[in-house]
Amino acid sequence: IYIFSGIQKMNSSFVPDTFEWMISAFDTVLSKRQLGIVTKFGYVIPYFELSIGVLLLVKQFRFIVVPLVILMHILILIMLGPTGKSYNSVVWPWNIIMIALILLLFADVKQERFFDISFLFKGLSFYIVITLMLIFPIFSLNNQYDSYLSSSLYSSNLNECQLILTDKAYKRLPNDLKAFCTTNVDHNVLYIKKWVEEELNVPCVPEYRIFRNAHHYIIQLTQTDSKEVKFNFIEREKLIEF
């Protein structure tokens, strides 16, 4: 998780779009100058996460890495939790569970769980985990696999989608959905991500099929067609071409 989470953050949008927004939770306790210094640290975050993912595998470094990982999750909870942005309520228990797993798996392990490494290769579950957590996420770097299933967490590099509505379709929208639209003389735009975040307080799954389902739903809701509700899909940056 940490290895791919770090790799996914190696893009030009992470610091200005996500990291600066997250650390703004401290704007009441830090000065602008201090926030500026912390912002520069954001460029190190991808490599920091990648490193801790690797170093957790090395027993000799765990006494340093485990406290750093726990501190990272605590800071994330402070920034995104009720005391900070109060955003994405799903991620609050997720961070607590990650701390518990780190302590369970890597802290103060005095005896190896398996004396013979070949024991791992005898179970089907080992190959399932390797496939889901190591092989499939590689394809996400070329946008051929789901971002969230590849630890692309707060990476700022996600697919985007807008539904562009004619005046006819816009007028048929319920008032609660109009709140998630911007309007001007030329067109009306419904932001699916904003809609999901406001109603559920969790991010939208940023995949083509999800956006298409929302597109079809709006067409049915407004009793129009794809000419009245246009689908504008913006693919995320591919970190690797293959």
Positions of PLM-derived features:
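Functionalized membrane-embedded alpha-helices
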Residues: 1-10, 38-79, 102-105, 151
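Transmembrane alpha-helix/helix-exit interface in multi-pass inner-membrane proteins
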Residues: 1-22, 144
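Hydrophobic alpha-helical transmembrane segments in integral membrane proteins
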Residues: 8-13, 134-158
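Short aromatic-rich membrane-water interface segments that cap or initiate transmembrane helices
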Residues: 27-41
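Membrane-interface junctions at the ends of membrane-embedded or membrane-associated helices
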Residues: 60-62, 105-120
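Loop-to-transmembrane alpha-helix initiation sites
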Residues: 84-101
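Internal/C-terminal transmembrane anchor helices
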Residues: 117-143
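Extracytosolic and intramembrane catalytic regions of membrane-associated proteins
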Residues: 153-242
